[in-house]
Amino acid sequence: MTAIYLNLTMAFSLALMGVLVYRSHLMSTLLCLEGMMLSLFILMTLLITHYRMSSISMLPLTLLVFSACEAAIGLALLVKMFTSYGNDHVQNLNLLKC
């Protein structure tokens, strides 16, 4: 069972490294964030079933809902940036502009 936990931890770490390395493009950052959320979801589900913690069994589903909302908002932002600027560079994204 520890090999599964190690693989999921490595998947999370690689996705985090992907966010840090490919942070210039929004699409790459969103894909790496989804990888992080998916590995957290699987790891949390395995830990809850392994330790039989039924009191927090809804937590992975809540994480999955928030990651779906994050993906929807990220893709909407990506479409808006692409129609406005023609590319997905994060440097074009300025939160001070309305």
Curated annotation (Swiss-Prot):
Record's subcellular location: Mitochondrion inner membrane
Domain of life the protein comes from: Eukaryota
Enzyme class: translocase
Keyword Transcription on entry: no
EC number per UniProt: 7.1.1.2
Cellular component GO terms, alphabetical: mitochondrial inner membrane; respiratory chain complex I
Disulfide bonds: none
Reactions it catalyzes: a ubiquinone + NADH + 5 H(+)(in) = a ubiquinol + NAD(+) + 4 H(+)(out)
Broad class of where this protein is predominantly found: mitochondrion
Keywords: Electron transport, Membrane, Mitochondrion, Mitochondrion inner membrane, NAD, Respiratory chain, Translocase, Transmembrane, Transmembrane helix, Transport, Ubiquinone
Membrane disposition: Multi-pass membrane protein
Transmembrane portions of the chain: 1-21, 29-49, 59-79
Gene Ontology BP, a term: ATP synthesis coupled electron transport
InterPro entries per UniProt: NADH_UbQ_OxRdtase_chain4L/K, NUOK/Mnh_C1-like
Gene Ontology MF, one: NADH dehydrogenase (ubiquinone) activity
Family statement: Belongs to the complex I subunit 4L family.
Physiological role: Core subunit of the mitochondrial membrane respiratory chain NADH dehydrogenase (Complex I) which catalyzes electron transfer from NADH through the respiratory chain, using ubiquinone as an electron acceptor. Part of the enzyme membrane arm which is embedded in the lipid bilayer and involved in proton translocation.
Subunit structure: Core subunit of respiratory chain NADH dehydrogenase (Complex I) which is composed of 45 different subunits.
Name of the featured protein: NADH-ubiquinone oxidoreductase chain 4L
Gene symbol of the encoding locus: MT-ND4L
